[in-house]
Amino acid sequence: MSESGGGTVATARQRQLVERALGEWQGEVAGRVIVVTGGARGIGRSLCEGLLRAGAKVVAADLTWDDADDFRKQLESDGSGMAVDMDITDDDALDAARDAVIDRFGTVDVLVNNASLVSETLFPPTGHRNTLDTTDRDWEVMFGVNVFGTLKAIRRFIEPMRAQQRGSIVNVVSSGVLAVAAGGGYHGLRPWTVEMPYQATKAAVMALTFYLAEEVRGDGVAVNAIMPGHTRASWFDATARAFNEQGIAYFMRPAIPEHLLPISLFLAAQDSAGASGRLYYVPEWNYDHGYGDYAAWQDHELPPDMEEIYSRLEAATPSYERAGVAHLPFDAQGALYAAGMANLGAQNSWTSNDSAQ
């Protein structure tokens, strides 16, 4: 699909959906103090920008701001925004960040645990590693950030929520933790990716979500988890290009980060009297609530070399009809099928793929 054929229209539709979400939830989140970890770039930055537009007081917390100085300046020039340096594995840094937020805004209403270490940053972006090929150190590093770091952040920022008997925590996890629900299909169609120990950390955070939600329900705090699905996060472009060099299309055309905004606004407005202890798959939630299916949020303004990758994949993928509108498969199973079939076509067989690596 070329930009001239669908990019402009898709972008206009996406903007319309974003505006609708802002209009629907602005009254609920305006004035609320929302902390977003990993807020300097990618999904986190997108959420911060959207939440600011909704009238929230937004704290973007991140370990590094080296390539995001423009956003930091934007936040610091906005009376409703704040940028903080915060390593979620460092107790002192977390304490200092919490104190700075309280000094500035007086409280915390919402915590979005978006920061995490992904496989693509712990390991080379291509090449296969089985679970038994990983080391204890790999697991310690990944769990240190994704599980213990998340828990450390919750311990600090839930304090003002419990004190005011109202708040919301949103944990970002991964749809890959539900691979068993697809009969192992997730791994079967992505044997060239490294899923462990990353998926194990996200499974741990999912379990944490369910138990913590019940434990703090009496304190007025909602705790939920969201699975974004295939999204153009900050690491995505480099990974897709690395796979393309080996003749593999990396999964499917990603969604823009803004597709997380509608559900994030919804959850930011919750407390324990509303939705809590739940796990949401973002593309399905969007569709169920009138915010379009996955295809409506796919990114059609990728760099030219990446457009070539995904146009090639889409040319080999059958479309289907939903509500009378032709789309590419949008759900998890459809995405896996599309990626698997396209890569089989490119590689001829998994055997030849293995021998190439």
Swiss-Prot record:
Its EC number is 1.1.1.256. The keyword Oxidoreductase applies. GO terms for molecular function: fluoren-9-ol dehydrogenase activity; NAD binding. The active site is at Y198 (proton acceptor). It catalyses: 9H-fluoren-9-ol + NADP(+) = 9H-fluoren-9-one + NADPH + H(+); 9H-fluoren-9-ol + NAD(+) = 9H-fluoren-9-one + NADH + H(+). The keyword NAD applies. Pathway: Aromatic compound metabolism. It holds the Pfam family adh_short. GO terms for biological process: fluorene catabolic process. Keywords: NAD, Oxidoreductase, Plasmid. SUPFAM superfamilies: NAD(P)-binding Rossmann-fold domains. NADP(+) binds at residues 36-67, 87, 202. Signal peptide: none annotated. InterPro entries: NAD(P)-bd_dom_sf, SDR_fam. It is an enzyme of class 1 (oxidoreductase). Belongs to the short-chain dehydrogenases/reductases (SDR) family. Catalyzes the dehydrogenation of both 9-fluorenol and 1,1a-dihydroxy-1-hydro-9-fluorenone to produce 9-fluorenone and 2'-carboxy-2,3- dihydroxybiphenyl, respectively. This is Fluoren-9-ol dehydrogenase. It comes from Terrabacter sp. (strain DBF63). The gene is flnB.
